[in-house]
Structures are given as structure tokens and as C-alpha cells.
């Protein structure tokens, strides 16, 4: 190994109790000037976690696995936990999600999320919950946010529906998914959290429409083909251009349907540094979110204030 590379410094964001942060060969984050914040006490660091699964068609089994992994995250101090896209069901066929649809506010998946958030005293983000749509053959791909009392505080319906026609891989979510319309940001004790799902990641204008957010959450089930080519690049790009943390829990592995998902759940800081990553299989990623560090970065590189083309 190149000696210089072996001495790469992990940025301050990855050293202050930030879970399993690992050195990377990416450029280390600078030490931002602290003068503008000198009179203010540092904001507390809080820990977030993303769950990675390789879900199957059995909802009860998936909920049990999600519960186990959430408990693991709580044991590591996470106060906000996000589940991957379709955590409760990766069916044998696309229409399976329609067959387990739930009414808004009712059903076993929503009850699981509410009860778990309340019992573990965490903020919990569950995606995807297949909620009823006006069309009986389609459901909403809904992302639900519960506070630490178990109360639902936000719902986001996936806006951009994935289509792929590449060799032997064919996907068309619009056959079974009803597209959402509304951009959603939720106010939390941890700052403004922007909600998005999987394919949304390819549309930077969605994140601009969120205005200024502190944390972006993007539960996903990227295919191995598209994930290998684009996943990390897209995650880090959204973090860098918005100077925001990104929490990206993902499906990762082989599924009974024959589908392979990319995994590589990760947490990325506002400088684009990967703080934690899980390549494959069930598990969690955990890292600390440092609001003071983020504010200093935004002060040192005020790109968000320099936008001159305002389209949204």
C-alpha cells in the first residue's frame, strides 16, 4: 500500500464518536473556521442508524428481522433509525405489494412501526409501506416517520417511479405504484429531515425543492447493476451539493424472486465522506451527526447562499 495513502486522516466529522467510521482515500474534510460560531455552545452530536436487509415475501418474518436490527441500532445509541425500501416485503412478483396494501393509519406494518418507535423511544422511519391508492391495482410507496412517542409525524409518497430496460433486467414501477406529488420535509429534534426514496436520488431538483435540510434520508432497493455503477456517486453528490448528511439504508443481497440488490447502505457527511458502510447482508450502519461541524462547513463554503438560478 502507498505509505501516503495509509496515513490519510479521517475528518473531524468521523472522529468524534461517530460509530464505525473508517479511513477512506477520499479527500479529508477541511477544518472550517469557527469564529462565526465561537459565542455559541456546540450543538450536541446525535447518532443515527440505517438498517440493511435482504427481505423476502413473508411480512411477519421481515418484521421480526427489522425488530432485531432496530434493537441492535438502539444498543449502539441511535436515536433515529431508518429502514430500507420495501423492508416489510420483497415479493415473488410485483403485485405482491398490492395484495398486502394497508389503509392509511391501519394495518400490521404501521402498527409495528408505531409500537417499535414508542417502545424503543426512537424516531423511526419505515419505508416502504404499501398504502391504498385511488386505483385498486396500484399502491403508494409510502415512507412514514414516527416520533419517539410512536406518533406518526410525516408521510412521503415516492414521486419518481423506477423504469429500467437493460438486457435481461426489466422494471416498471408504474404498473403497481401510484406516484406521489408532494415534497416532504419533517422538523425533528435533529434538524430538518428531507424524505426521498430510491429512484428519487437521481433527481437533484427534488432536494433543491426541500430548501435547506440538515439530513437527507433515502431508503433504497437499488439493483446490483445500477447500484454498482451509480449508487455511491449519487449518494455522495447529494450530500456535497446540499452540504447535508445523507442516511441511505438499502436492501442488500439475493431475494427469493431472483432479484439481486446492491446493498452498500451508508451514511455520508456534508463533505461527501462515507462515515459507515455495509456492503452486503443484514446489519446496520451507525454514525454521529454533528450540527456544529455542518454549520461550520456551510459557513466556510456557503454554496447554498450562492445559488443564482432559482427554479423551485
What are these regions (language model features)?
Residues 39-48, 185-194, 215:
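Beta-strand-turn-beta hairpins that frame and shape the catalytic cleft
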Residues 2-12, 16, 21-36, 43, ...:
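C-terminal beta-strand edge segments of enzyme domains
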Residues 104-125, 192, 198-285:
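CN hydrolase (nitrilase-like) catalytic-core segments centered on the catalytic cysteine
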Residues 126-128, 142-145, 184-186, 265-267, ...:
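Short beta-strand scaffold segments in enzyme catalytic cores
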